[in-house]
Amino acid sequence: MLWLALGPFCAMENQVLVIRIKIPNSGAVDWTVHSGPQLLFRDVLDVIGQVLPEATTTAFEYEDEDGDRITVRSDEEMKAMLSYYYSTVMEQQVNGQLIEPLQIFPRACKPPGERNIHGLKVNTRAGPSQHTSPVVSDSLPSNSLKKSSAELRKILANGQMNEQDIRYRDTLGHGNGGTVYKAHHVPSGKILAVKVILLDITLELQKQIMSELEILYKCDSSYIIGFYGAFFVENRISICTEFMDGGSLDVYRKIPEHVLGRIAVAVVKGLTYLWSLKILHRDVKPSNMLVNTGGQVKLCDFGVSTQLVNSIAKTYVGTNAYMAPERISGEQYGIHSDVWSLGISFMELALGRFPYPQIQKNQGSLMPLQLLQCIVDEDSPVLPLGEFSEPFVHFITQCMRKQPKERPAPEELMGHPFIVQFNDGNSTVVSMWVCRALEERRSQQGPP
């Protein structure tokens, strides 16, 4: 048992902090830090890298008062962990209890053979760590671009792949600080979607990108876009994912209900999978729903996703037009806000237009909040019953309840008659619709 003599929270600056790094099946290593409140997330990862040199650690966890594991993968979440720990220490001191070290649990990426499910390899061209002992420098920069680049290298170092293996073809779109290309991976012959991102971007965008990588490594679902890996060259990071030849749903016109129902099943299953990991998508919209000619439907672009801490969050990110009323109002939100976005997205796909006529979406930019006030003030739009089935109308109506707690929970979504009706595994319906739509698009474009 280890004792810490900690004074009031305001005096923590001068106190010694002991962090106990738990090693799976091998005990633990204690690390003494003399300036705990100034400790950075990057510093902890560097020391974990020395304790576990064979693993690539991208995050770590600690336990809250209920014994639940909370993930730390940024300086902001690091501060939240330290604040929680110091408040616990103060309470223990008041009660005359023994003070335990701060226990953390490294979370390493899966081994390359297990993680890289699509058979590609990755090379970030990263050099070895410059730290040789578990000592933290008090002068390390907290928000430098160099540090962010090193963090990217740390996460992505898991194989052998370079830019010379990639042949870029068409531009698929823009977003989240980068451009997405259709590309050919020469050694494997695979077609990829490659998001290329310049690093001279805002720190907030860097944080979003890091979040996306973390979630892509974690996810293993047939309803989430497949992650091949990434490579780092000069001032660019390239993220390689599965290519969906049908593209995103925002480019399609009005979708028939029998097709939309089967698409909805896949999207709900994808969201339910994320929610089971305590992850909010936060940017559910048609352009982040991809289809292919095989009839598969997958969620993509987790650039604004993050671990759901204590089942609630309070930040401003995402695409305003699809935000739930509580998000537009700046209130707390959780899973039920994703449910609203699900509802308004499928209402748009069913109608072939955005459900609020007074809102003209400006593609690629966030809208002024005053233009979205109608979503907060007005009653939710309703699908016309004469044009759509009663189960579908009810599904959308429930998802778009103004009060978050009145919207369906994940298990209620999967059990809704509309979802149950189309949960038949019939991907042929979606496949035929995608192929037909692509053929119509090609015929309208004419010969090249």
Curated annotation (Swiss-Prot):
> What Gene Ontology terms describe where this protein resides (cellular component)?
cytoplasm; spindle
GO MF annotations, alphabetized: ATP binding; MAP kinase kinase activity; metal ion binding; protein serine kinase activity; protein serine/threonine kinase activity; protein tyrosine kinase activity
Known outcome of mutating S311D: Dominant active form
PROSITE patterns assigned? PB1 (PS51745), PROTEIN_KINASE_ATP (PS00107), PROTEIN_KINASE_DOM (PS50011), PROTEIN_KINASE_ST (PS00108)
Gene Ontology biological-process entries? cellular response to growth factor stimulus; ERK5 cascade; heart development; insulin-like growth factor receptor signaling pathway; MAPK cascade; negative regulation of canonical NF-kappaB signal transduction; negative regulation of cell migration involved in sprouting angiogenesis; negative regulation of chemokine (C-X-C motif) ligand 2 production
Residues annotated as binding ATP: L172, G173, H174, G175, N176, G177, G178, T179, V180, K195
Post-translational modification remark: Activated by phosphorylation on Ser/Thr by MAP kinase kinase kinases.
Which residues lie within the region annotated Interaction with MAP3K2/MAP3K3? Answer: 64-68
**Catalytic activity, per the record?**
L-seryl-[protein] + ATP = O-phospho-L-seryl-[protein] + ADP + H(+); L-threonyl-[protein] + ATP = O-phospho-L-threonyl-[protein] + ADP + H(+); L-tyrosyl-[protein] + ATP = O-phospho-L-tyrosyl-[protein] + ADP + H(+)
Q: Where is this region: Interaction with MAPK7?
A: 18-25, 117-131
* Positions where Phosphothreonine occurs in the chain: T315
In short, the EC number is 2.7.12.2
The annotated consequence of S311A reads: Dominant negative form
Name the consequence of E65A: Loss of MAP3K2/MAP3K3 binding
Enzyme class comes to: transferase
Q: List every stretch annotated Disordered.
A: 116-144
What InterPro entries does this protein's entry cite? Dual_spec_MAPK_kinase, Kinase-like_dom_sf, PB1-like, PB1_dom, PB1_MAP2K5, Prot_kinase_dom, Protein_kinase_ATP_BS, Ser/Thr_kinase_AS
- The segment(s) forming the Protein kinase domain are 166-419
Q: Where in the cell is it found?
A: Cytoplasm
What ranges does the record list as Polar residues composition bias? 126-144
What are the Phosphoserine sites (modified residues) in this protein?
S311
Q: What does this protein do?
A: Acts as a scaffold for the formation of a ternary MAP3K2/MAP3K3-MAP3K5-MAPK7 signaling complex. Activation of this pathway appears to play a critical role in protecting cells from stress-induced apoptosis, neuronal survival and cardiac development and angiogenesis. As part of the MAPK/ERK signaling pathway, acts as a negative regulator of apoptosis in cardiomyocytes via promotion of STUB1/CHIP-mediated ubiquitination and degradation of ICER-type isoforms of CREM.
Protein family according to the UniProt entry: Belongs to the protein kinase superfamily. STE Ser/Thr protein kinase family. MAP kinase kinase subfamily.
Could you identify this protein by its name?
A: Dual specificity mitogen-activated protein kinase kinase 5
Q: Which organism is it from?
A: Mus musculus (Mouse)
Q: Lineage in the entry? A: Eukaryota, Metazoa, Chordata, Craniata, Vertebrata
Q: Gene name? A: Map2k5
